[in-house]
């Protein structure tokens, strides 16, 4: 965040703060284990059918519970899709009788919470092999709790109007040809490549260097600031290239086109200093604290079973971002509309 010098950063912090407050409304956010350094097209999720019987209430009239079954500490990643995951899980866990507390943390910082006991569950992990090796394989402090059902795509994107005007821009070989279009006061005599939150999974600086591109990586500082930049570039027909991903509700609001980088092959990103290939597709998974899982009971079973599709996450994220709904209300709306989906998560 500290590297960002854009005025839009302040708006991004405000958006993220609202998401945090909404998600923590029922039980309050926990103190972070360390100082923090700071989701596909949206649409209605498929309706389920008759409300099932189960450990949670049949309808989400309220997300309240008595907290008698113990505490679950959920981590919220710094993007709205992750807030959608937590909002739905929090509501259902509270209905099951658990007290749920939440923390909003940078990805790497969150893993430290497995050691301190301040984080029990990460519901969306975007591939951190170094952290997985340390906390899962070596220290045995955490475990893989299976996929969350969402497939993540990271890449380089430009507004659709640019491809309409410059069709060959979609091929990375031609990026230097158009570098001057992307120059800003931040990038000097090079084209600007807009990075996002510096804590996200990314190796754009290495890609730029290893592909010999005349660009400079400039961080926006947050997801919210990146979204604003793409919205303005689409509206004002200004040039922009940057790091973005799917699932993310913005993909349905404006046309974004992914740049064709050298194709990903297994192992091409083994040395991130030498990487010269596209990002891999990510089968997003859940990570849980081992000591918590050992005594988690029904909550542990629920977390292992938690699995929904990109469209489900997008519908909740869209409601939070574009329909002025609190995370809790957006979660209740999805829960009411999809009883057969969340029933499959119940012990």
Residue ranges and their predicted role:
Residues 23-32, 40, 46:
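Bacterial lipoprotein signal-peptidase II cleavage site
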Residues 56-87, 106-108:
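Extracytoplasmic "Venus flytrap"
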Residues 65, 86, 105-141, 227-231, ...:
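Pocket-flanking alpha-helical
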Residues 67-81, 98-103, 190-194, 303:
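Short, well-ordered beta-strand elements
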Residues 77-80, 98-113, 218-229:
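Short helix-initiation/N-cap motifs at beta->coil->alpha
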Residues 119-123, 192-268:
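Ligand-binding pocket segment of bilobal, Venus flytrap-like solute-binding proteins
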Residues 141-193:
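A conserved helix-loop-strand patch within extracytoplasmic ligand-binding domains
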Residues 154-165, 281-295, 318-319:
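A bilobed periplasmic-binding-protein/Venus flytrap-type ligand-binding module shared by bacterial periplasmic
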């Amino acid at each position: 965040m500290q590297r960002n010098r854009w005025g839009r950063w302040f708006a991004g912090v405000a958006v993220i703060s609202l998401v945090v407050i909404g998600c923590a409304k029922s039980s309050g956010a926990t103190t972070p284990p360390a100082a923090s350094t700071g989701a596909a097209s949206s649409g209605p999720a498929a309706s389920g059918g008759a409300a099932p019987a189960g450990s949670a209430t049949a309808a989400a009239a309220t997300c309240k519970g008595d907290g008698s079954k113990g505490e679950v500490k959920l981590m919220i990643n710094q993007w709205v899709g992750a807030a959608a995951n937590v909002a739905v899980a929090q509501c259902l866990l509270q209905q099951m009788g658990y007290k749920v507390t939440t923390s909003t943390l940078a990805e790497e910082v969150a893993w430290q919470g497995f050691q301190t006991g301040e984080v029990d569950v990460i519901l969306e992990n975007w591939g951190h092999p170094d952290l997985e090796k340390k906390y899962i394989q070596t220290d045995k402090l955490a475990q893989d709790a299976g996929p969350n059902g969402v497939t993540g795509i990271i890449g380089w994107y430009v507004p659709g109007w640019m491809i309409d005007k410059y069709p060959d821009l979609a091929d990375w070989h031609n990026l230097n040809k158009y570098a001057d279009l992307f120059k800003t006061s931040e990038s000097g005599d090079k084209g600007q490549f807009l990075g996002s939150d510096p804590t996200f999974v990314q190796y754009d600086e290495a890609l730029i260097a290893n592909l010999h591109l005349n660009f400079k990586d400039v961080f926006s500082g947050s997801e919210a600031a990146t979204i604003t930049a793409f919205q303005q570039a689409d509206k004002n027909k200004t040039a922009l290239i940057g790091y973005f991903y799917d699932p993310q509700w913005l993909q349905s609001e404006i046309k974004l086109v992914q740049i064709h980088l050298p194709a990903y092959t297994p192992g091409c990103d083994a040395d991130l200093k030498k990487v010269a290939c596209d990002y891999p597709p990510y089968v997003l998974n859940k990570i849980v604290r081992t000591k918590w899982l050992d005594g988690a009971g029904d909550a542990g079973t629920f977390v292992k079973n938690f699995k929904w599709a990109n469209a489900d996450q997008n519908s909740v994220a869209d409601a939070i971002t574009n329909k002025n709904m609190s995370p809790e209300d957006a979660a209740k709306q999805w829960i009411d509309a999809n009883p057969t989906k969340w029933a499959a998560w119940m012990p």
